[in-house]
């Protein structure tokens, strides 16, 4: 018994491409006779043939007016049948301009997807320029303002400042593989407190080499040259000029996909080195106790449960080796660390992008007098596009910092931030940011709480010229005496881009 929605072809073998309306009788009111399909009945007339021809024409007309039928179960949809033979050129045009119909899990033709409205790129965003197979986006930032506490210590007077910065982003435009590099450099001059002048240079690069469709090689590296925070707990209160430090490193590894399961293995090396600090009396404070090299490896297993969402589990181990076997107090500060975390990545373009994870970390120190450091591990970087005009960013970071404070093995630092960007107009963007951080010193009752709140406006005059104004307030509250401070920073700036 044929299905209700299957084409029912007419019995005329000379024109089999014609069909009648599903469920309709072949020739209403006429019964088959012994004459077959000769067209003549028993009285030698052509009435039977004429009736069949009329029924066929009615069926063709009705079939052409049938709406498309989409099955939600196992029934198959009636496919349109061309009533006239197409030319070869017409068939080629139809094959080129018509996408094949998608099938659902039952084999039925799935409904057409809803065509979303095209979203135009930022009309005030930088376009960059092409150099061979690379796209370059340079920028220059000139700003100035006032900082009420550049030293981030109690009792430090305020000062006006100027800042000059430059950036260059390089992105490959290859059909396979990928390479990105970001260079950022700046220098701040304090007019009334020159000892707090500070450089800041950051270089980051990452590359992906597509070995096969399933296997990729991953390489990344970074370099940072900057001045230490004047309020660093590792520095004494009589530091006249914050020390400079270098932090550099990189990782290399590979990623392989087994269908939906992705395995990523990385190994890396990180290096941190400090210069001497200058004290108020002109003497130098040796900070080589803080210099160390870290070796580590990590393994991640991710499984794509649905397009754009990949839960994962990740674990890693590392070893920190200091340049000096013992510090100035005769203490060995080498340590081993391990962590494990679970999380998920989001790649829902235009809706939610980023990663969030939670777990636990631990550091075991070679010095038996030091307590092991253990704590929760929270890391995230999420961007949520709430509306076409509003974007929400959430960030969390957990790290273990080295310490040279007597009796302290290390400091567990946790930082959280939320930023809201809203476009009042396409050329006027408002930004509000809230942040909180805590430093817990293992082996000491000291706990530092850090807060930040800021707000600003960006006026996009053209794609190449942006003006900005912002205000930021920072303050620290600690249970240790003499370290609390508050800082208010006002900034006006001009940004030139390409």
Kindly label every feature range from the protein language model.
Residues 1-498:
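Gram-negative and organellar
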């Amino acid at each position: 018994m044929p299905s209700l929605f299957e084409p029912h072809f007419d019995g005329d073998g000379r024109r089999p491409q014609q069909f009648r309306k599903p469920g309709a009788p072949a020739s209403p009111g006429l019964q088959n006779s012994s004459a077959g399909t000769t067209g003549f009945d028993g009285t030698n007339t052509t009435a039977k043939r004429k009736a069949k021809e009329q029924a066929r024409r009615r069926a063709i007309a009705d079939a052409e007016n049938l709406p498309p039928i989409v099955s939600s179960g196992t029934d198959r949809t009636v496919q349109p049948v061309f009533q006239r033979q197409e030319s070869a050129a017409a068939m080629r045009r139809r094959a080129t301009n018509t996408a094949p119909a998608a099938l659902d899990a039952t084999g039925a033709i799935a409904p057409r997807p809803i065509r979303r409205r095209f979203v135009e790129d930022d009309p005030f965003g930088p376009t960059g320029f092409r150099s061979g197979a690379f796209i370059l986006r340079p920028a220059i930032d000139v700003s100035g303002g006032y900082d009420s506490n550049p030293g981030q210590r109690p009792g430090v007077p305020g000062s006006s400042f100027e800042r000059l910065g430059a950036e260059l982003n390089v992105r490959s435009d290859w059909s396979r593989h990928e390479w990105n590099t970001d260079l950022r450099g700046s220098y701040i001059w304090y007019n009334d407190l020159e000892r707090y002048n500070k450089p800041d240079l950051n270089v980051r690069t990452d590359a992906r080499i597509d070995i096969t469709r399933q296997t990729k090689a991953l390489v990344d590296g970074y370099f940072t040259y900057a001045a230490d925070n004047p309020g660093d707990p590792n520095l004494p209160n009589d530091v006249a000029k914050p020390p400079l430090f270098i932090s550099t490193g990189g990782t290399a590894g590979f990623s392989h996909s087994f269908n939906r399961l992705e395995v990523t293995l990385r190994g890396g090396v990180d290096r941190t080195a400090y210069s001497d600090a200058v004290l108020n009396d002109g003497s130098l404070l040796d900070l080589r106790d803080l210099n160390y090299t870290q070796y580590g490896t990590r393994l991640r297993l991710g499984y794509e449960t649905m397009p754009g969402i990949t839960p994962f589990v990740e674990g890693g181990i590392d070893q920190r080796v200091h340049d000096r076997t013992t510090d100035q107090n005769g203490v060995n500060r080498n340590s081993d660390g391990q962590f494990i975390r679970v999380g998920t990545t989001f790649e829902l373009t235009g809706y939610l992008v980023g990663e969030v994870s939670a777990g636990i970390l631990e550091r075991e120190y070679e010095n038996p007098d030091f307590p092991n450091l253990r704590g929760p591990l929270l890391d995230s970087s999420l961007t949520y596009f709430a509306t076409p005009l509003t974007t929400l960013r959430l960030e969390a970071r957990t790290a273990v910092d080295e310490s040279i404070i007597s009796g302290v093995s290390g400091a567990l630092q946790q930082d959280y931030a939320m930023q809201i960007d809203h476009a009042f107009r396409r050329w006027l963007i408002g930004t509000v940011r809230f942040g909180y951080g805590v430093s817990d010193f293992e082996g000491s009752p000291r706990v530092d709480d850090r807060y930040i709140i800021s707000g600003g406006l960006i006026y996009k005059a053209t794609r190449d010229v942006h003006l900005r104004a912002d205000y930021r307030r920072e303050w620290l509250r600690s249970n240790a005496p003499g370290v609390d401070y508050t800082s208010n920073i006002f900034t006006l700036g001009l940004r030139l881009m390409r």
